[in-house]
Amino acid sequence: MAQRNPEPTIRVLYATDSCVITYSLMLLTGQESSEGVYAISYDWSSELDDLFGRQPRAPNTDAGDGWSSTEQSDADQLATALLQRKPSVSFCLLSGMVGGASDEPQDRVRPMFVCVFSTWTGARALAMTLSHGHPLSSNTLLQALTEEATFLLHNDLILALAITTENVTARSGRTAAAAKYDPQRGSVKAAVIGHSTGRSGLTSVYIHHENKVLTAFRRLYCNNNTTPFWFASKFGPGEREIVLATRYYLFQAIRCSRSGGTYDLQAVKDFIRTYNVPAAPNPTGLDLTHLTSFSLLSKFCCQSWYSRGPCALALPRYVDLRIQADVAEVSALEGFIAADRQGLRVSDREFITYIYLAHFESFNRKQLYDHLLAVSIADPGDIDRITSTSSLKRGTIEKFFAQVRIQLNIRDYIAHNVNPRVVCLPASIGSQYAQDKTYTPSSTTMSTGSAPLGVCDTSTPILKLLDRVESSLAGRGWIQTIVSPNKPQSVHSTPPLDQSRGDELSPGVSSQCGISRRLLHIASSPPVNGRALPLEVLFGQKGVPGPAPVYRVALPSKRQAFAVIANDRWETTTQNLARPGGSKQAYEGGFALAGFGEIDDCSLAWRDLQLTRTTSGVCRTALASSNASAQMYINRNEIFNSSLAVSNIILDVDFGIKRRVPLGMLHLAMRGFRAGIITTLSLIFSDATVQWDSYPCYFYKTSCPPQLVRALHRGEPSSFPDYVDGVEECYMESDFIDDYAAMEEYTDGPMDDYEMMMVDNECPQAACDNTPPNKEGGKTPLQRLDDTDACECTEKMGFRVTVPVPPPYLLAGPEALRGLARIIQQAVVLERTFTESMCSVLRDFSFIDTGVYSHGRSLRLPFFCKVGDSGEVYGGLYPFYVIPPKCNDVDEFVAQHSNPANFHFHAAPRHPTITHVITDLGGDYVSFFERKVARNREAIMTKRATLESLLSSANVSIKSHEAVEAFVVDVVLGEVVSHLATHFPDQSGEYQTVGVHTVVTKPDWILMQINRSGNAYRSQGFSCLRAKHLRSARGLARTFLSISADVHGRLCASISQQCFATKCGNNKMCTIFTLEVDRAK
């Protein structure tokens, strides 16, 4: 093993008043100059630590010593030591761009010449230069310069210059015998052999080609034209930084540090900011503003107390340990994130939020400040403690990651984040509340024995019927929802967005009358003045009980109808599933088929699979009907009524999958899904009087695409629309906008990339052929489930899950239901059975859509199908059995899947006693990460101006619709019309005489619809600002204006439109432009 060279070395960064490259070449060629060399910074090898690591002596004023005598004494001592040890002194210049970082350590200085000061005069001159910044004369340098070591650095460059300047070429030919040379020019080989190196070689080239030599050296030494100001600004701003950072970054980062050589200059300066070792004032009395020459800069740096002594000696170790402490904290954060990446089952968006939050919690302003205080030292003796004093990791664990771990246990999650608000009622009042706030039992009874009673028609006839009904009720005190078109700016009218797609605006009908809102209001209203029930007036006969369900029916060609049904023959729709043999026998026989030895989740999943497989059905007609009354039995969507109580928890589940899922594993996953639901309900409905092991959860799966569809998808194109598994129709009724947060949360994208034509007579659910796997003794139960036939869904898989609210509870309002769905989402992803079955195939862990729980939103019922643009019927929702572990009657449980009372939001409760009504789940059941982001934003971010404060400054009350609308008409509309005239000149004329109507008022956002003024027969729509449409689609777009405050505290107005055309997103709200409002006008 080679021994380390004990020869001591010193490296000096030098500068001159003139061109440093020219001066250096003069020295290398043996020419003496009248100028001297200034030392800007220097470094020494470890063999000289005892020499330069001693603290310089301060003058003893009591003994009459001055700075000059102290300087002489220190210089003499240093000169003696240098003369004794004779270190090799390399004089260096900058090499490469200063300040950047690199993946690998790179030398930042390059030596120009090497000296050994072997005389007392030379050693003392060097000592005065290093300790006091005196210039070193060229004569002294020439006497001490060692040519062998110096020109060993430059001989290669000298040869390269000789070859290029003499214009020589390499020989041609592969062998020596075939070698050919250009007779007019010499060869490279001859030039290398014949040209001398060393001082004579450099002098020869320099004399004949001075400019080329200067250019080559300047490029090699990075065009070194630095100035004192450059050094002060680059390495400053203080004495400590300019002395210590210059030395460490240029010299010590490569020689002493293990990892410091890869950090940039700013990082080095940041390290030194926490290196608070005190030092005496600079003896020169100068500051950085005085450093206008290299002479002053050299004196300032060399006489600084940071240039030598324990402070200078300990810096490399401090930087190493400081880097170690920083990296340990950052690595801990990465370790936590890596661990949570596998265990934290949240949506992709939430996981991204989690990563940002984790970094914010670890590296926010306070955390970093505390960490920097912990790693700051004032005594070099305290360096070793900095790796253990930081609380950055410990504080992050306690304040953030411990809270994240709570999210991984549903019981802790609910205990910390959920605080249900329960209203306790006497049994008599509770029963009356349930009777008034849920559907009449006859509307969801399988067979009432009487003819169906209800109304069902398309939008235009329904609107006319509603006008007549409300006009009839107006004399009894009914408040009409129709608004006179002569008052478009009224604040009492119904919100827009209600016109059905495919139905043109009829003359005389205000576009502000929401069909679903009016129907929901009539269907759920009590008798007017205690006499006339609005539902009776709607049906035209007495004795009609209420409330009644309101449905939306999808028709071909994107049309739709609406229905209110008081009683119906549900058996014509739900009793289409034939069950050969008894369900119980089929269920219990599943063990024998599989050969399972014990009852566990795998065996129960297998029996669920057998029961689902034995259920066959009859598909609907091949094409949808244009007759609304007939189509109602093919497609039916319940419209959510926020004024009624909720008796069934209905979940719209859409799984995004990476590949096909074996049906056995899917049944196993749904058992885990059920377990998550039951766990949530048992914790929230703590007073429920039920047996949770036998409590029903009804699952319905969207039918798989048939074989014909897969053939079309793989081969020829089809004119049929994409097959959709889960997300419901994009019908946007007026009332959805009453909950803007729910609107944002709702997704509209297609679910399956399949095209479909149901022409076979076989139920789509039966398209998944689930023959039992061959018995193989070596396979585990889980492997047997994994070997079952796969579901035909390849990208998306839709489910509808319904769970009766356990007695004696009811839910009141959409907020409680939306919160419960979000908690169930959290509980399901924490269920081990579910995650182990589905984790590898799920694209996202956000699969329960909570946007459907808004007034006026519709959700398709089980046993009904979807309707394509061309009238084809597909995607029916059919039972997917998940039998409770302790089910008392399997046949009854299977039959209950067809009971409409189990899959309507507002069906009459099956239990007679209601004593608890949950109005809100309270607490912070929203995502922990969302809550954390909101709190951090409030605590850290600058307080932004609110919309209320901006309007108040204009003497407008945000609580007064009339005042806000007047402000918009007087101030905002003028700027909007001016902008339209500039950028949309063809459509701007439509906005010359318009008014506004308030739709939604939020604390930070107000949405208004722009209405045309004029008579009732004038079209209320506007031209689309995004695209040109055919004549039939012109003038049907609705325009909205919203005002809000931006992040800079400015009042902004946005124009949005909703166009019914397909190319514009089928009724999708789209922002056209946003502008700043000049309130000074």
Swiss-Prot record:
One of its GO terms (biological process) is DNA replication. It comes from the Viruses. InterPro entries: HSV_PRIM. It is an enzyme of class 2 (transferase). Pfam families: Herpes_UL52. A zinc finger (CHC2-type) spans 1024-1064. The record marks D652, D654 as: Essential for primase activity. Transmembrane segments: none annotated. Residues 484-508 are annotated as: Disordered. GO terms for cellular component: host cell nucleus. Associates with the helicase and the primase-associated factor to form the helicase-primase factor. Essential component of the helicase/primase complex. Unwinds the DNA at the replication forks and generates single-stranded DNA for both leading and lagging strand synthesis. The primase initiates primer synthesis and thereby produces large amount of short RNA primers on the lagging strand that the polymerase elongates using dNTPs. This is DNA primase. The lineage of its organism: Viruses, Duplodnaviria, Heunggongvirae, Peploviricota, Herviviricetes.
